[in-house]
Swiss-Prot record:
Cofactor(s) for this UniProt protein: [4Fe-4S] cluster; hybrid [4Fe-2O-2S] cluster
GO cellular component term of the entry, any: cytoplasm
Documented EC number(s): 1.7.99.1
Protein name per the record: Hydroxylamine reductase
Binding locations of [4Fe-4S] cluster: C3, C6, C18, C25
Catalytic activity: A + NH4(+) + H2O = hydroxylamine + AH2 + H(+)
Amino acid sequence: MFCYQCEQTDRTGARPGCASAKGNCGKDATTADLQDLLVHAVKGIAQYGAIARAMGAPDRDADRFVLYAMFTTLTNVNFHAARFVALLREAAQMRDRVKAACDASARAAGTVVPAQHGPAMWQPADDLAGLLEQAARVGVDNGLDKVGADIVGLRALVLYGLKGVCAYAHHARVLGYERDDIYEGIEAALAFLARDPDDVNALLTQALGLGRLNLTVMELLDSANTGRFGAQQPTAVRVSPVAGKAILVSGHDLGDLHALLEQTAGTGIHVYTHGEMLPAHAYPVLKAFPHLVGNYGGAWQDQQSDFAHFPGPILMTSNCIIEPMPQYRQRIFTTGPVGWPGVRHLEHHDFSTLIRAAQALPGFPATAAEETITVGFGRHAVLGVADKVIDAVKAGQIRHFFLIGGCDGAAPGRNYYTEFAEQAPDDTVVMTLGCNKYRFNRHAFGDIGGIPRLLDVGQCNDSYSAIRIATALADAFECGVNDLPLSLVISWFEQKAAAVLLTLLALGLRNIRLGPTLPAFVTPGVLAVLVEQFGIQPIGDAGTDLAASLARHAA
């Protein structure tokens, strides 16, 4: 295996990346290699999918399969090697179906389908050993000896950003929202990668194009979330347990949570959120269920402790699963793209097995003293008081805004974000999103003239809200976003964050502080380009960076 797609990748060798029997995320070499081969297979689907679309015959099932398949290869999503063997065979069948449709359309038009090469010609080997042999030839570092580390790193930047785009598009799709132009853009990016591009400018152009596509995808996902569940509202969320039977829901999928709430209504079972599901409490349709009683635990990397102590079953939706510990292995369930060998997987929103487990397990014996945190400051809530915010800035009550958000993780150096937020002066406002918020969301920040100093915008999926808030402020002050008293301090971990970063760069945002370490696939040569064109900066000392941010905008 060779994998360097996440922030926690091995950096102890001469070349960063996980290249042993098991990666730092817990993914074994077999699964990692099969994931590489699945990406290769999906490129082949896209090659013919682009032709089919140009002929006026797009295949919606193939479009959806591409999203799902790519999502399964994100960090901490699916660790089940047997599942990837099945997906590889399904990918070949899907590719052949799209190819047959292309051939039929061409015959009807009296033309022929242009010859395809590379991934479009792949055929799955008969057994696992053969598949692994194939995978060894199509890994992310394929061609390193010919094109060098900079080109391989830029290809990885495009690929990992594309994985994030596909994940966000899948989130929207399962809520019933999808668009042809998004599928077209994803196909085009995959077909681009299928050609093994080796031009720096073409790769950078493609990366920024994906950033623009991801903005469209996040806008669609925002429409999906608000269309299905209403606009977020500021809401106090209980973070201490209530006596009774209990189910814990982690991940990101609001649709799964909604289906579970419907199925548990009237059963006496309490439902708790975990990790990135915390913002669910701000959506009117979801918080209307009285048995959605609170949030339990912290960010995804705390799950082994959180889940072990939770007295009920756990449902893992979308990404962020870690190897289940023996204390809860028999009471954790997966759904959607998530998978772990030996863990029961639930399909089609049928949560009856999960509910029976909750009824059999003890639940919380007593109600603890109430503690709350406040969420729900999405774009509708913040822009609804925009006049008040603008007046506070003009009056000198608000000096600066910080967006401190992104993915959390267990690596050393992430206390930087806690220190940065807690040291922010009292005349500044901190916006946050993603699970990075758990680093400081129990700190008492207070308010400025009734405006909370800590504004929880939502999930990492809600980056669109943060962008809309920033652009609305820029419009109000008749300036560019880069001219606002606003600093972006971003924590990254996996490929959704890579997609969001590309979106910020595509929008022309500069001087982003990124950490806790820079992506391993960003070579010194690529970093030099990003620094020159976008002013990207690695994080340093929290106090020093905070002072520099305030000084830059005060100058």
